C-alpha cells in the first residue's frame, strides 16, 4: 500500500523542516519517495535496520536521520526526521 503516516513527533519535525530549511525538506521528501520505490533496506541515505527496535533509519545529512517503520501492509510510519535517532 505504501501510505505514509507520522507520529506526533515525526510530523512536528517534518513541518519544522518544511518551514525552516527547504534543502533538508527536499532531501527528506526524496528519501520518502525512495523508501516507497525501493523498500526499507535499499536505495539512498544508507538505510540500516535499528538494533533497539523494529524500525529503520536513513541519513538525511551528518546530523539528522529519518527514522521509520514499515508494517505488514507496507505502510510507512515516520517516527523522527530531526537529530540522530533519539537525540
Labelled PLM ranges:
Residues 1-4, 9-17, 22-26, 59-65, ...:
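Enriched for short, Lys/Arg-rich terminal
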Residues 33-59:
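A short, surface-exposed loop/turn module that caps and links secondary-structure elements
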Amino acid at each position: 500500500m505504501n501510505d505514509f503516516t507520522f507520529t506526533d513527533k515525526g510530523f512536528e519535525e517534518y513541518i519544522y523542516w518544511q518551514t525552516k530549511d527547504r534543502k533538508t525538506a527536499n532531501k527528506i521528501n526524496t528519501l520518502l519517495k525512495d523508501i516507497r520505490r525501493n523498500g526499507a533496506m535499499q536505495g539512498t541515505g544508507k538505510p540500516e535496520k535499528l538494533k533497539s527496535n523494529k524500525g529503520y533509519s536513513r541519513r538525511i545529512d551528518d546530523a539528522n536521520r529519518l527514522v521509520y517503520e514499515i508494517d505488514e501492509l507496507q505502510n510507512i510510519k515516520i517516527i523522527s526526521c530531526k537529530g540522530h535517532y533519539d537525540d
